[in-house]
Amino acid sequence: MKIEKKSFPFLIREDRGVFLQRLKVFPQGFIVLESENLSGEAGAENGGKICGYLCSELWRQFPSSDEFFSVGHDISLAHCPGGSALYISSFAVLPEFRGSGNGGAFFRMALDSIEKEQKNLSEEILIVNENWNAARHIYSNNGFLPCFEIKGAFCTNLFRWENGIVMKRILHRAE
């Protein structure tokens, strides 16, 4: 929960229950970045540090409404085993590990891992705050394109509502 607290404003942080539900419903879609992956040091199980995560769920298809994009939504209502759309519900890296390419490399590695296991995927979806330029850069560099905007999707610590951009990447898989 330390990563969530250091990465997101209070009003859009997800609580422990949401993370536990994600782990229970789709454990293959919850991937962590350990300091071992960055420096060759011992991993979390040997005293290393968990410094990032990516949470996801499978959807039957790209949604036709905004409701599934809400913070803290019930994954058990949205998740569809064998679904063709991967929704990246949360992605974060501790601030001290940002700025040197770690986030982008981890994001790509996490998606590669999920894609390898989930052969039915045809698209990947996420929502990002319009003002989170570093995150948008990572997503754009990985082939995600803006689809539409959700007005007032994110609330800052200053109680200012900011728009979210839903982005999608179509997978072109070899048969």
Question: Regions from the language model: what does each represent?
Answer:
Residues Q28-V32, Y53, S90, I125, ...:
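Short hydrophobic/aromatic beta-strand element in the GNAT-like acyltransferase core
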Residues S140-E149:
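Conserved acetyl-CoA-binding loop of GNAT-fold acetyltransferases
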Residues N46-G47, C55-S90, A153-F159:
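Conserved acyl-donor/pantetheine-binding loop and adjacent beta-alpha core of acyl/acetyltransferases
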Residues F107, I114-E130:
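Conserved GNAT acetyl-CoA-binding A-motif
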